[in-house]
């Protein structure tokens, strides 16, 4: 029989019990709208299969009015589909309480209802529920939550930035690390941690069009974040009134958005908590005028609370451009360019003084006077202690200066010079004779730098005339691969056509196992190619990538890189090397560069090596030099004027050396210390590695897979294949693929095998599986036989699991203070609680299953006795619950008060602390304390134990 819904009726969500009591708002056609006042959430359900249970109390139940007074139900009346409860209050006065006035925070005794209804579950499910509660609680308390589950090597500076930024309310910061230090990973960590904590629920990512795929791959592969990529086609074809409203994470190309006013209107209307803008240094701003892209981002930044800008370093940008990024974050603070220049100049001597302290371990008289003038009287004691050689005082002094840094809270910028762990590079150039077949090709960059593409484009050729039959680079590549034997080699070329042709050449001419990787392949096809390359035993020796196809991928398990050709821009060159040159690379990078002599390829090699020094070192000046010398460079690549060419390379080398000297002298070591975390990040690294070594997750997941009917088989070392079995319990289990998936718990394995799912406590499969356990009712009842000689046969013990539950928005993060750990009670016949003396695991080892029919018969026979004991159980754990709530309130208040005091004091000396940030923190404290005050005990599960 179909459910009858009426506005005002109270229902509870079967899948989201934490939302509290729901109120039916409307029934519109096939949709049902329910409001959950406790959290402010609204849900829409299909009328046919809404996951809702009607809230209907019975005589004898005690219920609560929204004003807080309680009523013991004597009679229930149905008035036009709405329930009216009649009973007496705490003073034995008669009262009437319509269901519309019920407290939104009322908890339900669903476990006892199921027990007495004969819905008794297997013992294994009761244990699974208990263990799920304990693991879930532990993760909520962990400082690593949102940081440790990423498919990446834990790196100190990235973790420090992620925690520092993600733990703020509506962070507004500039991430300006040097190339290769992982700004995208830092941004992904911030997004991931903010989503998991509830600080953000909707995220907008704006990127240049050519980086959309790279971001899509990074977010999906590293963070398991399902990002919706929007372009003109998807926007037009969507049936939704506002396509953006259905996306929790939207990835949008800025070029398209600027040209589409309708899409802009929809984007503004959708509402976002956090905006991330990549390549923000390309947003053009001058005091007189801003570009359309800058103006659009500025408008979005005015209405979106959190903003992350990913950009080049301030030294690369120049002061004016750097100021333009800062004013996007806080236009009130950064409103005057001239004032900003003056402030920056005033601060430079302080940074130089700190550099002296870091380098020499002491301060000269000049540096001492500079810092004293900056800190005032309050810094005199610290300076005196520093002068006496107190290292702790030096650390405190640096912290004081950091807090006063003009942009220290909004700007994070790490440099390779300050970060350890990068590999060295070795260059191996191979000049080769230019074949005569290329001599007659038409002029143009494509023909001159990539002659094989131009040759093939001339028309159909026989197999014997294909370019890879005569191009000496192919002969060289085959010989090199044979010399390196089974060593993994990554080959990158500019075009997909070249990559595919090279695979043909290796197959036909050498039989060397190779695979290809280009933008014409689907993500799944690329994953398979990458996995084939990564396989040490049976995999390909060589992976041949096109320029675009390799974006966002990590192949650092290899250390030989062949550049079959060279890209036309130094940024692309750095991207190529960056596929292998990453923190954590254990070997020296071997760069193999074959090029055709007396050709533009040779000159481009000379430009990068002799002019830009871009092979052996990163080239932070490459973009500026390309912009400055580009107009002269391109014509000279093809011309034979040796004198003009030599002059250009020499000029570029001199300019590069000058720019690098400026960059080095402009380094702000104080800012680097703040960005690197000064040791805090390393503690996070060690904690994550320690967590990786534990076996709790694999053990737990094996029981979860067994419970849900997921078959688990060995795949290879440190890897398992999961497949749904015929007895799969719930089709909604988040396996990820109906055909099955390959998983690993090993971080190293996951980094080299991107086709495998990397399971951590944060993975959607783990979180989704735990949610299915806790949101469902399975496992909240059980009956068992206990084999213990100390107990008389027939003795009945009652095990009750309670949870301290807070109904509140996720953004308050109250699970950090009052996690839903099980409060356990084990009652004997005399009402004594034995839980402290008998551990859960110890008890479990003594239990045997009882057939369901026998269990039900026993429960029905003992119903009254069991009901009385269940009613008495809450009093046993109530003191523990109240103590936990009080401790949670104390921790929340202490943390919030400490942070409020720090920010308030900081604001007095550093204007980048926003009033809105302090106000939001104060409100969060108030709301959190109020919600904890209403924390209630909920009976989670019941297990009846009969001695036999």
Swiss-Prot record:
Subunit (UniProt): Interacts with the RNAP. Has a higher affinity for the core RNAP than for the holoenzyme. Its ATPase activity is stimulated by binding to RNAP.
Domain of life: Bacteria
Enzyme Commission number(s) from the entry: 3.6.4.-
Protein name in the entry: RNA polymerase-associated protein RapA
Gene3D superfamilies in the cross-refs: 2.30.30.140, 2.30.30.930, 3.30.360.80, 6.10.140.1500, 6.10.140.2230, P-loop containing nucleotide triphosphate hydrolases, Tandem AAA-ATPase domain
GO biological process: regulation of DNA-templated transcription
Domain Helicase C-terminal: 473-627
Organism taxonomic ancestry: Bacteria, Pseudomonadati, Pseudomonadota, Gammaproteobacteria, Pseudomonadales
């Amino acid at each position: 029989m179909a459910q009858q819904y009426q506005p005002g009726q109270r229902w509870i969500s079967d899948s989201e019990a934490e939302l509290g009591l729901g109120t039916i708002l409307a029934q519109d056609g096939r949709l049902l709208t329910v409001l959950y006042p406790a959290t402010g959430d609204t849900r829409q359900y299909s009328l046919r299969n809404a996951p809702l249970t009607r809230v209907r109390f019975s005589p004898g139940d005690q219920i609560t009015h929204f004003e807080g007074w309680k009523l013991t139900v004597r009679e229930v009346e149905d008035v036009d589909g709405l329930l009216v409860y009649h009973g007496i209050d705490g003073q034995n006065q008669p009262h009437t309480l319509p269901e519309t006035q019920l407290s939104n925070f009322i908890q339900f005794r669903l476990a006892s209802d199921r027990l007495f209804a004969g819905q008794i579950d297997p013992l294994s499910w009761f244990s699974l529920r208990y263990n799920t509660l304990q693991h879930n609680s532990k993760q909520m308390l962990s400082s690593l939550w949102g940081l440790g589950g990423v498919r990446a090597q834990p790196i100190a500076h990235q973790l420090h930035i992620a925690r520092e930024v993600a733990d703020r309310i509506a962070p507004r910061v500039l991430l300006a690390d040097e190339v290769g230090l992982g700004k995208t990973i830092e941004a992904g960590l911030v997004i991931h941690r903010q989503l998991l904590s509830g600080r953000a629920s909707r995220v907008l990512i704006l990127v240049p069009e050519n980086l959309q795929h790279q971001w899509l791959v990074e977010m999906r592969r590293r963070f398991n974040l399902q990002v919706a990529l929007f372009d003109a086609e998807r926007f037009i074809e969507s049936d939704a009134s506002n396509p953006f409203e259905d996306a929790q994470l939207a990835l949008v190309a800025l070029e398209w958005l600027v040209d589409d006013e309708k899409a802009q209107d929809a984007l503004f209307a959708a509402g976002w908590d956090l905006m991330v803008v990549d390549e923000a240094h390309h947003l053009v701003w001058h005091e007189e005028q801003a570009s359309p892209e800058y103006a659009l981002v500025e408008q979005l930044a005015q209405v979106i609370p959190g903003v992350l800008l990913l950009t080049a370093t301030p030294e690369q940008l120049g002061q004016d451009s750097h100021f333009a990024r800062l004013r996007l974050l806080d236009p009130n603070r950064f409103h005057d360019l001239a004032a900003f220049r003056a402030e920056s100049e005033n601060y430079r001597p302080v940074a130089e003084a700190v550099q002296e302290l870091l380098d020499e371990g002491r301060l000269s008289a000049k540096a001492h006077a500079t810092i004293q003038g900056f800190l005032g009287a309050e810094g005199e004691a610290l300076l005196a202690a520093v002068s006496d050689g107190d290292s702790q005082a030096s650390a405190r002094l640096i912290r004081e200066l950091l807090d006063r840094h003009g942009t220290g809270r909004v700007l994070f910028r790490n440099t390779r010079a300050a970060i350890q762990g990068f590999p060295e590079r070795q260059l191996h150039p191979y000049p080769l004779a230019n074949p005569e077949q290329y001599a007659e090709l038409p002029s143009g960059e494509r023909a001159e730098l990539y002659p094989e593409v131009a040759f093939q484009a001339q028309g159909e050729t026989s197999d014997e005339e294909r370019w890879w039959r005569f191009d000496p680079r192919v002969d060289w590549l085959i010989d090199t691969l044979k010399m390196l034997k089974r060593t993994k080699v990554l080959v990158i070329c500019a075009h997909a056509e070249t990559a595919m042709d090279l695979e043909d050449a290796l197959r036909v001419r050498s039989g060397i196992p190779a695979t290809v990787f280009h933008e014409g392949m689907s993500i799944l096809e690329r994953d398979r190619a990458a996995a084939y390359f990564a396989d040490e035993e049976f995999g390909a020796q060589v992976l041949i990538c096109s320029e675009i196809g390799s974006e966002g991928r990590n192949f650092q398990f290899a250390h030989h890189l062949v550049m079959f050709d060279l890209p036309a821009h130094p940024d692309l060159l750095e991207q190529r090397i960056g596929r292998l040159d990453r923190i954590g690379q254990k070997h020296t990078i071997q760069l193999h560069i074959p090029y055709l002599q007396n050709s533009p390829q040779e000159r481009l090699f000379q430009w990068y090596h002799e002019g830009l020094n871009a092979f052996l070192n990163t080239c932070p000046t490459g973009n500026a030099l390309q912009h400055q010398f580009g107009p002269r460079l391109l014509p000279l690549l093809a011309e034979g004027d040796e004198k003009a060419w030599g002059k250009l390379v020499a000029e570029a080398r001199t300019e590069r050396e000058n720019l690098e000297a400026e960059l080095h002298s402009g380094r702000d070591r104080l800012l680097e210390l703040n960005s690197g975390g000064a040791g805090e990040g390393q503690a996070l690294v060690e904690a994550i590695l320690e967590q990786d070594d534990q076996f709790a997750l694999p053990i737990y997941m094996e029981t979860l897979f067994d419970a849900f009917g997921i078959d688990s088989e060995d795949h290879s070392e440190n890897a398992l294949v999961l497949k749904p079995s015929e007895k799969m319990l719930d089709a909604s289990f988040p396996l990820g693929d109906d055909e099955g998936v390959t998983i690993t718990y090993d971080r190293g394995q996951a980094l080299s095998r991107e086709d495998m799912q990397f399971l951590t406590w944060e993975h959607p499969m783990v979180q989704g599986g735990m949610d299915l356990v806790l949101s469902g009712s399975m496992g909240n009842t059980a009956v068992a036989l206990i084999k213990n000689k100390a107990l008389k046969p027939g003795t009945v013990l009652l095990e009750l699991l309670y949870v301290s539950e807070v109904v509140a928005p996720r953004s308050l993060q109250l699970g950090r203070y009052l996690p839903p750990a099980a409060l356990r009670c084990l009652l004997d016949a005399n009402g004594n609680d034995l839980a402290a003396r008998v551990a859960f695991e110890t008890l479990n080892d003594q239990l045997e299953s009882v057939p369901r029919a026998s269990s039900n018969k026993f429960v029905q026979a003992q119903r009254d006795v069991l009901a009385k004991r269940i009613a008495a159980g809450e009093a046993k754990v109530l003191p523990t619950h109240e103590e936990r709530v009080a401790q949670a309130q104390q921790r929340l208040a202490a943390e919030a008060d400490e942070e409020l005091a720090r920010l308030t004091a900081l604001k007095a000396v550093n204007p980048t602390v926003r009033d809105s940030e302090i106000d939001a923190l104060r409100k969060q404290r108030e709301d959190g304390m109020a919600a904890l005050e209403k924390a209630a005990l909920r009976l989670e599960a019941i297990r009846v134990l009969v001695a036999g």
